[in-house]
Amino acid sequence: MNRKVYTSRLSSFLPNAPVDNDEMENILGYVGGHPSRIKKIILRQNQIKQRHYAMREGNLTHTNAELMVNAINGLFDNEFDANAIELLACGTSTPDQLIPSHASMVHGLLKGSNPIPLLSVSGVCCSAVQALEFAFLSVLSGHTSNAVCGGSELVSPLLRSDMFEEEYRTINQVQENPYIAFEKDFLRWMLSDGAGCVLLTDKPMGKMSLEIKWIESV
């Protein structure tokens, strides 16, 4: 097989203005009305300074599908637009709904796109890589000459303070068993919202095209 696959364009989308660490609980809410006892420990270790949330005043500003569409729109110009996409593969662990699938919802929001093969992948941190592998194999095999794949997550609704009432009722475990308390609070200070995508092509497009030699996910 002599066909080649290139990453010809990249795009990303982060919703709303960045949120500093000191402002996080103003967006997510205070569990039990009090600042987190674990937050500073986690932030000191992960070194994250800012993040983006698709939520303001407790209300969503973007759906997961909208995050992905905004990222995909960043791939387009006069030479390549939605009408030219031959395959769409989307990975996420937090779809807006199960049916229709995440990729179907993204495709439905893409203005000007034709009927094309779709793939929705759910596999936590592996979701986007598995979508990338499928898109890569499609172009490599000659089934399509290009493919758009990406990953998006909308986790902020799951990080709201009202989702952590059980943790608040056992907050004394911070002192009695710090490991358990850290484990419960950990993801709240690690995750945020956003989307990224890549255009794969069978021929280079521009000076920044990089060839993918192989992808293997297990």
Show where each model-derived region lies.
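Conserved phosphate-coordination/catalytic loops
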Residues: H62, E66, C126-V129
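Short glycine-rich or small-residue beta-strand-to-loop segments that form or flank ligand, phosphate
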Residues: E86-T94, S120
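Short, well-ordered amphipathic alpha-helical segments that serve as non-catalytic structural scaffolds
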Residues: H34-I41, T63-E79, H102
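Acyl-thioester C-C bond-transforming condensing/cleaving domain
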Residues: N2, N73-N78, A82, L98-P100, ...
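Condensing-enzyme catalytic core mediating Claisen C-C bond formation in acyl metabolism
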Residues: M1-H62, E176-V218
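Residue-level signal for short, function-critical loop segments
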Residues: F13, G91-T94, E153
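Short acidic-aromatic active-site loops that bind/stabilize oxyanions
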Residues: E57-A65, T92, D96
